[in-house]
Structure formats: C-alpha cells, structure tokens
C-alpha cells in the first residue's frame, strides 16, 4: 500500500475529495399494467416481473 511521504494540506485534501460526486441513476421507461413508469435500469427486469412496488410514489 502506498504511504505518503509528506502530509497533505487540508485544502489539497478537500479539493481532491470534492472530485467524487454521486450521480443519479439512469432511468428507463417501462410499461407495467398499461402505465408508463421510469425505473433505474438495474430494476427493469424486477419491475416487469412485478417484484418492485411502483405505486409508492
């Protein structure tokens, strides 16, 4: 594992950490029981099979 040679300043640490950002999941339109819904792509199969409750919103 890499060991830093010198201490990193607070400003450099925070600016480096600020590069990490959360992204919203890409939504895909799926029709369930005649209604169009937008779900994340990884839940597409579960939504079609009825394993996900889409009426919570």
Curated annotation (Swiss-Prot):
Residues 1-19 have a biased composition (Basic residues). InterPro entries: Ribosomal_bL32 (IPR002677), Ribosomal_zn-bd (IPR011332). Pfam families: Ribosomal_L32p. Transmembrane segments: none annotated. Signal peptide: none annotated. One of its GO terms (biological process) is translation. Residues 1-20 are annotated as: Disordered. One of its GO terms (molecular function) is structural constituent of ribosome. It comes from the Bacteria. Keywords: Ribonucleoprotein, Ribosomal protein. GO terms for cellular component: large ribosomal subunit. SUPFAM superfamilies: Zn-binding ribosomal proteins. NCBIfam families: rpmF_bact. Belongs to the bacterial ribosomal protein bL32 family. This is Large ribosomal subunit protein bL32. It comes from Mycolicibacterium smegmatis (strain ATCC 700084 / mc(2)155) (Mycobacterium smegmatis). The lineage of its organism: Bacteria, Bacillati, Actinomycetota, Actinomycetes, Mycobacteriales.
